[in-house]
């Protein structure tokens, strides 16, 4: 591949990313602010992030980023959650569930479990 073609493709990819970032502006609204405040105010708990499949990969990255920036956090494997791992979810935690469809049974199980405690905050992110 020639240098000119490589530069063209690189610029094209960057433009796609720029356009995608610009389109996110519309999502900075009241719901976004509420979500951010819930996360910021998680003082006596931890941030637990979960997802299934590709969403699980994203969830794992989010948990790692929260942890590396000083926010107590971990990734909860949704497929193992129903087999004893949900016990890691405790009062004052924030549970963030990432899903493409919002229909994953594994995540529904986490929602059902977490809903039993009013001090656990649930955040759902779907496409």
List each model region and its residues.
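Glycine-rich phosphate-binding loops that contact phosphosugars or nucleotide phosphates
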Residues: 40, 45-127
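An N-terminal, well-structured beta->alpha segment
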Residues: 2-45
